[in-house]
Amino acid sequence: MRWQLHSPRRYAGAHSSMSNCPPPMSQVIIKTPAQLDLMRRAGQLLAQVFADLDSFIRPGVTTMQINDRAEAFIVNTLKARPASKGQYGFPYSLNTSVDHVVCHGIPKVDEVLKEGSIINVDITLEQGGYIADSSKMYGIGAISDEARRLVDTTYDALWKGIEQVRPGATLGDIGHAVQAHAEAAGYSVVREYCGHGIGQQMHEGPEVLHIGQRGMGMKLKPGMVFTIEPMINQGKRGTREMKDGWTVITRDHSLSAQWEHTVAVTEQGFEVLTLREEER
């Protein structure tokens, strides 16, 4: 679940204007090995939620049914808590963003998934006092080659960013890698929303932009944990928030895709705490 720049509302971070300068190091909470163990456990549980949804998400299912199934699985099977529910007044357990919805899509009882659509499912889970955050794209039935290329390019851009993570690298290295990969494919990077530090709170420092310059911004240190979650548009990068105060769409109604993982900086490089079985 991403952190919003510009606005103090909803998912906003502590900063009211977009900047290439992340929060100072004092706002970043370095996790101990014991805390990382708890976050790793939360991430493993979250991966199980997506595994449960993999065979459930298909044409004819409503986005509210996705919400209800995930919530039941988190609470009843995993004995954990859907961390998004109640956060900033959000009433549901996850976000469902279909086609030209960039992020923060609200589950609806009358939103039926149709053949050829794409959907991002964004879930947070808390157990043991620590939160994990991840999102995954699903193609509904057979999707177009154009939609598949966008989804795959966005996934690759996520990993280009993750692969930059190591002690001494900078946040700008991550943003540059994501941006360069997406723009080389002819796509645009959404700039109003970003990744964020995470731990006992859903949104901690630093802000992790998906654009940037190599060598710029905060240097990474072991024990930092944050999300990388690029939102990539097929058309122009402009977005617009809908009247419901949550849903964000592309201004030109082009398709948008997004993938997310929670990543820890280790002494050797990085660890993806929310890695799913098919990614191992």
Language model segments and positions:
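Active-site neighborhoods and metal-handling regions in enzymes and metal-associated proteins
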Residues: 3-11, 15, 19-280
